[in-house]
Protein backbone atom coordinates (compact mmCIF):
# COMPACT_ATOMS: atom_id res chain seq x y z
CA UNK A 1 0.00 0.00 0.00
CA UNK A 2 1.22 3.49 -0.87
CA UNK A 3 0.34 6.48 1.29
CA UNK A 4 1.05 9.94 -0.14
CA UNK A 5 1.54 13.46 1.20
CA UNK A 6 -0.01 15.48 -1.61
CA UNK A 7 1.49 18.97 -1.23
CA UNK A 8 5.09 17.89 -0.80
CA UNK A 9 4.72 15.32 -3.59
CA UNK A 10 3.38 17.92 -6.03
CA UNK A 11 6.21 20.27 -5.14
CA UNK A 12 8.84 17.61 -5.72
CA UNK A 13 7.47 16.66 -9.12
CA UNK A 14 7.11 20.28 -10.23
CA UNK A 15 10.72 21.04 -9.34
CA UNK A 16 11.96 17.84 -10.94
CA UNK A 17 10.12 18.32 -14.18
CA UNK A 18 11.57 21.80 -14.51
CA UNK A 19 14.62 20.93 -14.23
CA UNK A 20 37.47 0.53 -3.69
CA UNK A 21 39.77 -1.75 -4.40
CA UNK A 22 40.01 -4.54 -6.97
CA UNK A 23 36.41 -4.35 -8.09
CA UNK A 24 36.66 -0.63 -8.74
CA UNK A 25 39.65 -1.28 -10.96
CA UNK A 26 37.66 -3.58 -13.22
CA UNK A 27 36.23 -0.83 -15.43
CA UNK A 28 35.78 2.84 -16.11
CA UNK A 29 32.81 4.83 -14.79
CA UNK A 30 30.77 4.15 -17.92
CA UNK A 31 31.46 0.43 -17.57
CA UNK A 32 30.19 0.17 -14.03
CA UNK A 33 33.29 1.26 -12.10
CA UNK A 34 33.21 3.44 -9.03
CA UNK A 35 33.12 7.20 -8.82
CA UNK A 36 34.16 9.39 -5.94
CA UNK A 37 33.41 13.09 -5.73
CA UNK A 38 36.46 15.19 -4.81
CA UNK A 39 36.59 16.43 -1.23
CA UNK A 40 36.35 20.12 -0.43
CA UNK A 41 39.15 21.93 1.36
CA UNK A 42 36.97 24.70 2.79
CA UNK A 43 33.41 25.58 3.58
CA UNK A 44 32.66 25.75 -0.13
CA UNK A 45 34.45 24.58 -3.25
CA UNK A 46 35.71 26.96 -5.92
CA UNK A 47 32.47 26.29 -7.81
CA UNK A 48 30.42 27.30 -4.79
CA UNK A 49 29.34 23.76 -3.87
CA UNK A 50 28.91 23.12 -0.13
CA UNK A 51 31.61 21.41 1.89
CA UNK A 52 31.65 17.63 1.72
CA UNK A 53 30.08 16.58 5.00
CA UNK A 54 29.80 12.84 4.53
CA UNK A 55 30.21 9.85 2.27
CA UNK A 56 27.47 7.98 0.44
CA UNK A 57 27.81 4.55 -1.15
CA UNK A 58 25.56 3.42 -4.00
CA UNK A 59 25.22 -0.09 -5.40
CA UNK A 60 23.47 -0.27 -8.77
CA UNK A 61 22.18 -3.68 -9.91
CA UNK A 62 23.45 -4.23 -13.46
CA UNK A 63 23.66 -2.72 -16.92
CA UNK A 64 21.85 -5.48 -18.84
CA UNK A 65 18.25 -5.38 -17.60
CA UNK A 66 18.11 -1.69 -18.50
CA UNK A 67 20.70 0.76 -19.76
CA UNK A 68 19.10 3.38 -17.48
CA UNK A 69 21.31 2.42 -14.52
CA UNK A 70 24.45 3.65 -16.28
CA UNK A 71 23.09 6.20 -18.76
CA UNK A 72 20.60 7.90 -16.45
CA UNK A 73 20.90 6.96 -12.77
CA UNK A 74 24.69 7.07 -12.41
CA UNK A 75 25.17 10.58 -13.88
CA UNK A 76 22.09 11.91 -12.10
CA UNK A 77 23.25 10.51 -8.76
CA UNK A 78 26.75 11.90 -9.30
CA UNK A 79 25.32 15.33 -10.06
CA UNK A 80 22.93 15.25 -7.09
CA UNK A 81 25.64 14.24 -4.62
CA UNK A 82 28.06 16.81 -5.99
CA UNK A 83 25.44 19.55 -5.68
CA UNK A 84 24.77 18.44 -2.10
CA UNK A 85 28.47 18.48 -1.25
CA UNK A 86 28.61 14.76 -0.57
CA UNK A 87 31.45 12.41 -1.41
CA UNK A 88 30.07 9.42 -3.29
CA UNK A 89 31.13 5.93 -4.29
CA UNK A 90 28.93 4.50 -7.03
CA UNK A 91 29.44 0.89 -8.11
CA UNK A 92 27.56 -1.60 -10.27
CA UNK A 93 27.12 -5.26 -9.29
CA UNK A 94 26.60 -6.22 -12.96
CA UNK A 95 23.96 -8.79 -12.10
CA UNK A 96 26.10 -10.81 -9.68
CA UNK A 97 24.84 -11.36 -6.11
CA UNK A 98 28.40 -12.22 -5.07
CA UNK A 99 29.69 -8.93 -6.47
CA UNK A 100 26.78 -7.14 -4.81
CA UNK A 101 27.82 -8.56 -1.45
CA UNK A 102 31.48 -7.70 -1.99
CA UNK A 103 30.63 -4.13 -2.93
CA UNK A 104 28.47 -3.85 0.18
CA UNK A 105 31.35 -5.06 2.35
CA UNK A 106 33.77 -2.65 0.68
CA UNK A 107 31.51 0.34 1.18
CA UNK A 108 31.04 -0.48 4.85
CA UNK A 109 34.83 -0.76 5.19
CA UNK A 110 35.21 2.55 3.33
CA UNK A 111 33.15 4.16 6.09
CA UNK A 112 30.12 5.38 4.17
CA UNK A 113 27.58 7.24 6.29
CA UNK A 114 24.64 6.22 4.12
CA UNK A 115 24.28 3.20 1.85
CA UNK A 116 21.90 3.36 -1.12
CA UNK A 117 21.12 0.10 -2.90
CA UNK A 118 19.04 -1.24 -5.76
CA UNK A 119 18.79 -4.92 -5.00
CA UNK A 120 19.23 -7.79 -7.42
CA UNK A 121 16.97 -10.01 -5.34
CA UNK A 122 15.51 -9.87 -1.83
CA UNK A 123 18.12 -12.19 -0.31
CA UNK A 124 21.23 -10.30 -1.40
CA UNK A 125 19.52 -6.98 -0.73
CA UNK A 126 18.54 -7.96 2.81
CA UNK A 127 21.99 -9.37 3.56
CA UNK A 128 23.55 -6.03 2.66
CA UNK A 129 20.99 -4.06 4.66
CA UNK A 130 21.62 -6.24 7.72
CA UNK A 131 25.39 -5.73 7.51
CA UNK A 132 25.04 -1.98 7.03
CA UNK A 133 22.66 -1.60 9.95
CA UNK A 134 24.93 -3.67 12.19
CA UNK A 135 27.65 -1.16 11.32
CA UNK A 136 25.37 1.75 12.22
CA UNK A 137 24.87 2.84 8.60
CA UNK A 138 21.49 4.12 7.39
CA UNK A 139 20.11 2.41 4.28
CA UNK A 140 17.99 3.83 1.46
CA UNK A 141 16.36 1.43 -0.99
CA UNK A 142 16.65 3.06 -4.42
CA UNK A 143 13.98 2.37 -7.06
CA UNK A 144 13.23 -1.14 -5.73
CA UNK A 145 11.97 -1.89 -2.24
CA UNK A 146 13.71 -4.93 -0.76
CA UNK A 147 10.80 -6.83 0.76
CA UNK A 148 11.73 -8.02 4.25
CA UNK A 149 14.93 -5.99 4.12
CA UNK A 150 14.12 -3.29 6.64
CA UNK A 151 15.64 -0.33 4.82
CA UNK A 152 15.22 2.98 6.62
CA UNK A 153 13.90 4.87 3.58
CA UNK A 154 12.75 4.24 0.03
CA UNK A 155 13.05 6.42 -3.08
CA UNK A 156 11.23 5.49 -6.27
CA UNK A 157 8.28 6.24 -8.52
CA UNK A 158 4.64 5.29 -8.09
CA UNK A 159 5.15 1.86 -9.61
CA UNK A 160 1.49 0.85 -9.74
CA UNK A 161 0.97 4.04 -11.73
CA UNK A 162 3.81 2.99 -14.06
CA UNK A 163 1.92 -0.20 -14.87
CA UNK A 164 -1.38 1.63 -15.22
CA UNK A 165 0.21 3.97 -17.77
CA UNK A 166 1.48 0.99 -19.75
CA UNK A 167 -1.91 -0.71 -19.79
CA UNK A 168 -3.81 2.45 -20.71
CA UNK A 169 -1.16 3.42 -23.25
CA UNK A 170 -1.57 0.11 -25.07
CA UNK A 171 -5.36 0.37 -25.01
CA UNK A 172 -5.31 3.92 -26.36
CA UNK A 173 -2.81 3.10 -29.12
CA UNK A 174 -4.79 0.06 -30.27
CA UNK A 175 -8.09 1.92 -30.30
CA UNK A 176 -6.46 4.80 -32.20
CA UNK A 177 -5.66 2.22 -34.90
CA UNK A 178 -9.28 1.06 -34.91
CA UNK A 179 -8.52 -2.11 -32.93
CA UNK A 180 -11.28 -2.25 -30.31
CA UNK A 181 -10.95 -5.88 -29.22
CA UNK A 182 -8.61 -8.84 -29.54
CA UNK A 183 -5.97 -10.92 -27.82
CA UNK A 184 -3.10 -9.41 -25.88
CA UNK A 185 -0.39 -10.80 -23.60
CA UNK A 186 1.87 -9.74 -20.74
CA UNK A 187 5.65 -10.04 -20.60
CA UNK A 188 6.47 -9.15 -17.02
CA UNK A 189 9.66 -8.22 -15.21
CA UNK A 190 11.60 -10.57 -12.94
CA UNK A 191 9.59 -12.50 -10.36
CA UNK A 192 12.17 -11.53 -7.71
CA UNK A 193 11.64 -7.79 -8.32
CA UNK A 194 8.92 -6.20 -6.19
CA UNK A 195 8.60 -3.43 -8.77
CA UNK A 196 7.62 -5.97 -11.42
CA UNK A 197 4.79 -7.11 -9.16
CA UNK A 198 3.59 -3.52 -8.78
CA UNK A 199 3.84 -2.80 -12.51
CA UNK A 200 1.71 -5.86 -13.26
CA UNK A 201 -0.80 -4.85 -10.62
CA UNK A 202 -1.23 -1.56 -12.47
CA UNK A 203 -1.59 -2.78 -16.04
CA UNK A 204 -3.59 -5.88 -15.18
CA UNK A 205 -6.22 -3.77 -13.40
CA UNK A 206 -6.47 -1.26 -16.25
CA UNK A 207 -6.88 -4.01 -18.86
CA UNK A 208 -9.51 -5.72 -16.69
CA UNK A 209 -11.44 -2.50 -16.09
CA UNK A 210 -11.46 -1.64 -19.80
CA UNK A 211 -12.78 -5.08 -20.73
CA UNK A 212 -12.05 -4.79 -24.46
CA UNK A 213 -9.12 -7.17 -24.72
CA UNK A 214 -8.50 -10.79 -23.73
CA UNK A 215 -5.24 -11.73 -22.01
CA UNK A 216 -4.04 -15.00 -23.58
CA UNK A 217 -0.45 -15.03 -22.30
CA UNK A 218 1.23 -14.02 -19.05
CA UNK A 219 4.92 -14.83 -18.47
CA UNK A 220 8.06 -13.27 -17.09
CA UNK A 221 10.73 -11.99 -19.43
CA UNK A 222 13.08 -11.75 -16.44
CA UNK A 223 14.17 -8.24 -17.55
CA UNK A 224 16.17 -9.93 -20.31
CA UNK A 225 15.67 -8.95 -23.99
CA UNK A 226 16.53 -12.41 -25.33
CA UNK A 227 14.21 -14.14 -22.87
CA UNK A 228 11.42 -11.71 -23.72
CA UNK A 229 11.93 -12.38 -27.42
CA UNK A 230 11.61 -16.12 -26.86
CA UNK A 231 8.46 -15.61 -24.80
CA UNK A 232 6.98 -13.59 -27.66
CA UNK A 233 7.80 -16.40 -30.10
CA UNK A 234 5.81 -18.79 -27.89
CA UNK A 235 2.87 -16.41 -27.61
CA UNK A 236 2.82 -15.70 -31.35
CA UNK A 237 3.01 -19.38 -32.29
CA UNK A 238 0.00 -20.10 -30.08
CA UNK A 239 -1.90 -16.90 -30.91
CA UNK A 240 -0.96 -15.45 -34.31
CA UNK A 241 -3.91 -13.08 -33.93
CA UNK A 242 -2.22 -11.14 -31.11
CA UNK A 243 -2.85 -7.40 -31.34
CA UNK A 244 -0.68 -6.15 -28.49
CA UNK A 245 1.73 -6.88 -25.66
CA UNK A 246 2.27 -5.16 -22.35
CA UNK A 247 6.05 -5.46 -22.18
CA UNK A 248 7.39 -4.18 -18.88
CA UNK A 249 10.45 -2.21 -20.06
CA UNK A 250 12.21 -0.89 -23.15
CA UNK A 251 14.94 -3.52 -23.05
CA UNK A 252 12.50 -6.41 -23.24
CA UNK A 253 10.42 -4.52 -25.80
CA UNK A 254 13.54 -4.29 -27.95
CA UNK A 255 14.02 -8.06 -27.73
CA UNK A 256 10.38 -8.60 -28.68
CA UNK A 257 10.54 -6.16 -31.59
CA UNK A 258 13.61 -7.97 -32.95
CA UNK A 259 11.58 -11.19 -33.04
CA UNK A 260 8.62 -9.35 -34.57
CA UNK A 261 10.87 -8.13 -37.36
CA UNK A 262 11.94 -11.72 -38.01
CA UNK A 263 8.25 -12.65 -38.28
CA UNK A 264 7.40 -9.57 -40.36
CA UNK A 265 4.87 -8.22 -37.85
CA UNK A 266 6.71 -5.24 -36.38
CA UNK A 267 4.28 -2.36 -35.95
CA UNK A 268 1.31 -4.67 -36.49
CA UNK A 269 1.44 -5.98 -32.93
CA UNK A 270 2.06 -3.06 -30.58
CA UNK A 271 4.19 -3.31 -27.45
CA UNK A 272 4.79 -1.06 -24.46
CA UNK A 273 7.96 -0.10 -22.63
CA UNK A 274 9.46 1.73 -19.69
CA UNK A 275 12.57 3.82 -18.91
CA UNK A 276 12.48 6.09 -21.98
CA UNK A 277 15.80 4.75 -23.27
CA UNK A 278 17.16 5.94 -26.61
CA UNK A 279 16.31 2.56 -28.15
CA UNK A 280 12.81 2.63 -26.72
CA UNK A 281 12.17 6.17 -27.88
CA UNK A 282 13.39 5.28 -31.38
CA UNK A 283 10.99 2.33 -31.41
CA UNK A 284 8.17 4.66 -30.37
CA UNK A 285 8.95 7.04 -33.23
CA UNK A 286 9.01 4.14 -35.70
CA UNK A 287 5.58 2.94 -34.59
CA UNK A 288 6.82 -0.37 -33.19
CA UNK A 289 6.19 0.64 -29.59
CA UNK A 290 2.96 2.27 -28.41
CA UNK A 291 4.91 4.33 -25.92
CA UNK A 292 7.27 4.20 -22.97
CA UNK A 293 7.06 5.31 -19.36
CA UNK A 294 9.41 8.19 -18.59
CA UNK A 295 10.73 8.19 -15.06
CA UNK A 296 12.85 11.30 -14.66
CA UNK A 297 15.68 9.81 -12.62
CA UNK A 298 17.07 13.26 -11.85
CA UNK A 299 14.08 13.62 -9.47
CA UNK A 300 14.80 10.22 -7.94
CA UNK A 301 18.51 10.99 -7.55
CA UNK A 302 17.88 14.36 -5.93
CA UNK A 303 15.46 12.79 -3.47
CA UNK A 304 18.10 10.21 -2.52
CA UNK A 305 20.68 12.96 -2.02
CA UNK A 306 18.24 15.04 0.06
CA UNK A 307 17.55 12.06 2.32
CA UNK A 308 21.25 11.26 2.64
CA UNK A 309 22.26 14.77 3.65
CA UNK A 310 19.40 14.95 6.17
CA UNK A 311 20.59 11.70 7.73
CA UNK A 312 24.21 12.86 7.85
CA UNK A 313 23.27 16.24 9.34
CA UNK A 314 21.15 14.62 12.04
CA UNK A 315 17.93 16.12 10.67
CA UNK A 316 14.59 14.33 10.41
CA UNK A 317 14.48 12.65 6.97
CA UNK A 318 10.79 11.82 7.34
CA UNK A 319 10.01 15.49 6.66
CA UNK A 320 11.31 14.90 3.12
CA UNK A 321 9.13 11.84 2.56
CA UNK A 322 6.09 12.24 0.34
CA UNK A 323 4.39 9.21 1.83
CA UNK A 324 5.11 5.60 2.71
CA UNK A 325 5.14 2.16 1.11
CA UNK A 326 4.21 -0.95 3.02
CA UNK A 327 6.77 -3.73 3.30
CA UNK A 328 4.38 -6.66 3.27
CA UNK A 329 7.04 -9.07 4.55
CA UNK A 330 7.71 -7.05 7.70
CA UNK A 331 4.30 -5.43 8.02
CA UNK A 332 5.79 -1.95 8.34
CA UNK A 333 5.43 1.27 6.38
CA UNK A 334 8.71 2.55 4.96
CA UNK A 335 9.00 6.38 4.71
CA UNK A 336 9.24 7.04 0.99
CA UNK A 337 9.73 9.67 -1.68
CA UNK A 338 7.68 8.69 -4.73
CA UNK A 339 7.71 10.70 -7.95
CA UNK A 340 5.17 10.61 -10.77
CA UNK A 341 5.90 8.71 -14.02
CA UNK A 342 4.83 10.08 -17.42
CA UNK A 343 3.61 8.22 -20.54
CA UNK A 344 5.57 9.18 -23.66
CA UNK A 345 4.30 8.80 -27.22
CA UNK A 346 5.85 9.88 -30.51
CA UNK A 347 4.39 13.35 -30.02
CA UNK A 348 6.14 13.83 -26.66
CA UNK A 349 9.55 12.20 -27.20
CA UNK A 350 11.08 15.68 -27.26
CA UNK A 351 10.01 16.11 -23.61
CA UNK A 352 12.55 13.47 -22.59
CA UNK A 353 15.28 15.19 -24.59
CA UNK A 354 14.37 18.57 -23.10
CA UNK A 355 14.61 17.04 -19.61
CA UNK A 356 18.17 15.99 -20.41
CA UNK A 357 17.52 12.27 -19.97
CA UNK A 358 18.18 11.24 -23.58
CA UNK A 359 19.95 12.81 -26.54
CA UNK A 360 18.46 13.43 -29.96
CA UNK A 361 21.70 12.14 -31.50
CA UNK A 362 21.23 8.73 -29.87
CA UNK A 363 17.50 8.54 -30.58
CA UNK A 364 17.58 9.77 -34.17
CA UNK A 365 20.44 7.76 -35.64
CA UNK A 366 19.09 6.32 -38.89
CA UNK A 367 15.61 7.79 -38.40
CA UNK A 368 16.36 11.47 -38.88
CA UNK A 369 13.24 11.94 -41.00
CA UNK A 370 11.00 10.73 -38.18
CA UNK A 371 12.76 12.95 -35.68
CA UNK A 372 12.18 15.91 -37.97
CA UNK A 373 8.51 14.94 -38.30
CA UNK A 374 8.02 14.79 -34.52
CA UNK A 375 10.24 17.74 -33.65
CA UNK A 376 12.97 15.77 -31.87
CA UNK A 377 16.16 17.81 -31.84
Regions found by a protein language model. Give the residues of each.
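Bacterial Sec-type N-terminal signal peptides, specifically the leucine/valine-rich hydrophobic h-region
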Residues: 20-23
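A residue-level marker of the well-folded mature domains of exported/periplasmic proteins
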Residues: 2-9, 13-14, 25-377
Amino acid sequence: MVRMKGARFASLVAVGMLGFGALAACGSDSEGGGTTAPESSGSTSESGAPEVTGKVGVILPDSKTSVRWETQDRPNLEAAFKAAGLESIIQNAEGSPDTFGQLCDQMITEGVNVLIETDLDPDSGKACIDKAKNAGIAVIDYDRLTLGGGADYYVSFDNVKVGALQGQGLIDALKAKGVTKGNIAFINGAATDNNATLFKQGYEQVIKDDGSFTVVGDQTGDWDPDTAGKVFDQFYAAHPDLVGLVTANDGMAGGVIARMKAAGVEGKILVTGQDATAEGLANVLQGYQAGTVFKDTSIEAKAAADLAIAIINGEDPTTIATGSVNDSELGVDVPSVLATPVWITADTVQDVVTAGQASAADICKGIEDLCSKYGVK
